[in-house]
Amino acid sequence: MSVSQQLSELASKEKTVLYVADQNLEEVLCFPESTDRTTLVQLTDACLHANELAKHLEFGKPLSITNQYSRGSCVLQIAKEKKDGSGMVVSTTIAAHNALRGALKCSNALDQVISQL
């Protein structure tokens, strides 16, 4: 079974949305691949929350976010360049959805984007 098949299977079983950047922290890969409106809204919401939270707290660049809707939690991985430029430090945060939303509730830009979906 390929990696993409494994990720897709995990995503469907756990009602999980995976958002992952590549090694250059640029390209984004999302599972499950879906055109379902509800799933796309949840996925966009999760990605925006991860990016805005990281930016707001100056954490670095989001590397991946795993949203476990069935468990009501997010696992957020952030990559930040070391001060001496010798590589990246990756930190992992586990938070409830409400905690992520609470940290960003003052973000009008985020609300505007979500309301347009």
Swiss-Prot record:
<dbReference type="GO" id="GO:0000329">
    <property type="term" value="C:fungal-type vacuole membrane"/>
</dbReference>
<dbReference type="GO" id="GO:0071986">
    <property type="term" value="C:Ragulator complex"/>
</dbReference>
<dbReference type="GO" id="GO:1903432">
    <property type="term" value="P:regulation of TORC1 signaling"/>
</dbReference>
<protein>
    <recommendedName>
        <fullName>Uncharacterized protein tam1</fullName>
    </recommendedName>
</protein>
